[in-house]
Design a protein with these regions (language model features):
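Conserved short histidine dyad/triad with adjacent acidic residue
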Residues: 47-69
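Short acidic-glycine-tyrosine-enriched beta hairpin
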Residues: 88-109
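Short beta-strand His + acidic residue motifs that chelate non-heme Fe in jelly-roll/DSBH
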Residues: 58, 84-85, 105-107, 112-117, ...
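Glycine- and acidic-residue-biased ligand/ion/polar-headgroup-sensing regions
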Residues: 51-52, 70-87
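Double-stranded beta-helix
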Residues: 113-150
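Short, surface-exposed beta-strand-loop junctions and turns on beta-sheet-rich folds
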Residues: 64-65, 90-92, 121, 129-131
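A short, N-terminal "cap"/entry segment at the start of jelly-roll beta-barrel domains
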Residues: 1-47, 142, 149-150
Length: 150
């Protein structure tokens, strides 16, 4: 569970009562392991922070068959600024957020679009194998005259 001081550094973006994204601000800083996703998500995201000298035991991961129905992707902003526009599953604009260097977003469900606000370098992580055109439905972004940042 996040402490009160950490809550502002981690935001859950809800659309129509469903969790569509988790944003972890560059300011988030807590010792130990903090998972931000429930166990049933097909993409897990956690913060791990330890003092110098901490030993993490060597390990391998066992083969476990999993079924993935939706692609969930994590974006790690290394440099620059990126606006993320969030859409409902019905492709209707709902809200936007601006990410900066050091921020991380896990895109869970719903639609999303992006505008690069400052020269950007980011890393994307998502499940594979890539399904090509079957993996996504592209749509025309209909943005309101004034974006929402609630």
């Amino acid at each position: 569970m996040l402490s009160r001081s950490d809550r502002s550094a981690v935001e859950e973006v809800q659309i129509d009562g469903e969790l569509c994204a988790i944003i972890i601000s560059a300011e988030y800083d807590d010792l130990g392991i903090q998972f931000f996703t429930p166990n049933e998500f097909s993409q897990q995201i956690a913060s791990m922070s330890y003092p110098s000298g901490k030993v993490i035991p060597a390990h391998t991961h066992n083969p476990v068959r999993r079924e993935v129905f939706y692609t969930q992707e994590a974006l790690f902003i290394r440099k620059g600024r990126l606006r993320v526009d969030f859409y409902s599953q019905e492709q209707e604009y709902r809200t936007s957020r601006v990410l900066s260097a050091g921020d991380v977003v896990l895109l869970i469900r719903g639609g999303h679009g992006f505008e690069v606000l400052q020269d950007l370098n980011m890393v994307e992580v998502k499940q594979g194998p890539y399904a090509g055109d079957m993996d996504k439905t592209r749509f025309s972004a209909v943005l309101p005259p004034k974006l929402k940042f609630d």
